[in-house]
Amino acid sequence: MGLSDGEWQSVLNVWGKVEADLAGHGQEILIRLFTAHPETLEKFDKFKNLKTPDEMKASEDLKKHGVTVLTALGGILKKKGQHEAEIKPLAQSHATKHKIPVKYLEFISGAIIHVLQSKHPGDFGADAQGAMSKALELFRNDIAAKYKELGFQG
């Protein structure tokens, strides 16, 4: 399930584009997540009242959370699969405090792929999409394993 060096390079190349505008990418990814899967909004007290994409775009809290999410994910991706230290506290908080099901991590992975494809078509072709999908699946599988250790059935 691991990625080749070339695949990791592809992931990190496009991630450099994300880091150039964490707020913009994070906002778009969360809006995509919440509009495609409105049930995910229920896990976010700060965002439950946001019903339209325009309301979501106007939310500074949503923008800040997008930066938080993508900063954490970037730190994990840069570890190229050697992310045990980063995954453990994330799994702990998402299992015990936030109670985020693995299915929702699949949903946000889809939102990430969609937004990167729309914002960076020249840098995110089929090979890059495949590499990112594998990297996100590796992340989800490792989170799911930690959830299991914690007794969370998410």
UniProtKB/Swiss-Prot annotation:
It is found in: Cytoplasm, Sarcoplasm. Signal peptide: none annotated. One of its GO terms (molecular function) is heme binding. The lineage of its organism: Eukaryota, Metazoa, Chordata, Craniata, Vertebrata. It catalyses: Fe(III)-heme b-[protein] + nitric oxide + H2O = Fe(II)-heme b-[protein] + nitrite + 2 H(+); H2O2 + AH2 = A + 2 H2O. Monomeric heme protein which primary function is to store oxygen and facilitate its diffusion within muscle tissues. Reversibly binds oxygen through a pentacoordinated heme iron and enables its timely and efficient release as needed during periods of heightened demand. Depending on the oxidative conditions of tissues and cells, and in addition to its ability to bind oxygen, it also has a nitrite reductase activity whereby it regulates the production of bioactive nitric oxide. The modification Phosphothreonine is found at T68. Disulfide bonds: none annotated. PANTHER family: MYOGLOBIN. Its EC number is 1.7.-.-, 1.11.1.-. It comes from Nycticebus coucang (Slow loris). Residues 2-148 form the Globin domain. This is Myoglobin. SUPFAM superfamilies: Globin-like (SSF46458).
